[in-house]
């Protein structure tokens, strides 16, 4: 996700030299305040560069890094040190996503997940809160199949492919206005440089808008021919990709493996 003003986000702008660090070393930026000596020792063994750690300001510094991002990021996932109202005890309690995890009881009320030794971006979108549902296997939240935002972006794509790019921009901006981000053509970062540029911006917009949804994004990726690059970062068939299940600081815990280009076209039954 970009910044709210349309500027591309880079961790290097927040923490200079971030991308040159190993994922383990830069995990220090994501740690909770007031670590114990035991926690610090364990994190050093993991590879965290504790010279980067602020004992009493680490959480606030990290939260500030997310403050100006596209609001759809925080609406889609639970960000580090943000809260989530859970109901696992039978009562609605406010938990905070922290690392390392300690306990989900007072006074900490850390968000307990399936993997308490790791820190992921857990889903927030369409996840029940508090005591809205009695089991994680089902929810009363209706999952949209086709949203109005998709109608607008499909229309924008069709108009752009017809060469009606200025008209198409208006429909993309309807989605961006609702999301609370800068309109296209409103500043240097959002300036549209023609049909090809808007085509890519529509692809990006659909990913930001529909992340984590069960709508048409997968079919769109196949249709655009970007599924291999978007999901597997262009890795060769059978090889581990740089994409995968990652901790928030980028450690790839479970790399994806691309099966091959045949996935783009399903076989036609011969009988």
Listing of model-derived features with the role each one plays in the protein:
Residues 1, 32, 117, 122-123, ...:
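Generic hydrophobic, helix-prone segments enriched in Leu/Val/Ile
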Residues 1-21, 107, 135-145, 169-172, ...:
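Long, intrinsically disordered, low-complexity segments
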Residues 1-103, 229-236:
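An aromatic- and glycine-enriched ligand-binding surface/loop that stacks and positions planar moieties
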Residues 50-55, 131, 188-189:
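A short linear-motif detector with a strong N-terminal bias
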Residues 57-72, 76-79, 86, 108-117, ...:
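Charged/polar interaction segments and conserved charged motifs
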Residues 65-69, 73-78, 122, 142-177, ...:
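Extended, hydrophobic/aromatic-rich amphipathic alpha-helical segments that build helical scaffolds
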Residues 106-147:
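Active-site beta-strand/loop architecture of penicillin-binding DD-peptidases
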Residues 182-186:
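Boundary/linker segments of alpha-helical solenoid repeat arrays
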């Amino acid at each position: 996700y970009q910044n709210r003003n349309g500027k591309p986000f880079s961790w290097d702008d927040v923490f200079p030299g971030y991308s040159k660090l190993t994922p383990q070393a830069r995990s220090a930026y994501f740690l909770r305040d007031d670590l114990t000596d035991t926690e610090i020792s364990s994190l050093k063994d993991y590879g965290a560069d504790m010279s980067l750690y602020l004992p009493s300001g680490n959480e606030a510094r990290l939260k500030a890094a997310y403050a100006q991002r596209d609001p759809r990021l925080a609406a889609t996932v639970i960000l580090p040190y943000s809260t989530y109202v859970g109901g696992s005890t039978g009562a609605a309690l406010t938990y905070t996503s922290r690392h390392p995890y300690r306990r989900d009881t007072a006074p900490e009320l850390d968000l307990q997940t399936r993997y308490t030794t790791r820190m992921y971006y857990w889903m927030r979108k369409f996840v029940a809160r508090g005591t809205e549902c009695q089991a994680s296997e089902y929810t009363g939240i209706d999952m949209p199949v086709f949203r109005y935002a998709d109608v607008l972006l499909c229309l924008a794509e069709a108009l752009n492919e017809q060469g009606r790019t200025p008209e198409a921009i208006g429909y993309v901006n309807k989605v961006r206005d609702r999301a609370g981000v800068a309109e296209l053509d409103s500043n240097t970062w959002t300036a549209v440089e023609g049909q090809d540029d808007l085509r890519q911006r529509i692809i990006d917009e659909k990913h930001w808008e529909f992340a984590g949804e069960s709508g048409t994004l997968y079919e769109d990726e196949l249709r655009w021919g970007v599924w291999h690059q978007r999901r597997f970062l262009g890795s060769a068939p059978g090889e581990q990709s740089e994409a995968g299940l990652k901790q928030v600081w980028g450690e790839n815990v479970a790399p994806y493996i691309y099966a091959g280009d045949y996935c783009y076209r399903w076989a036609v039954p011969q009988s």
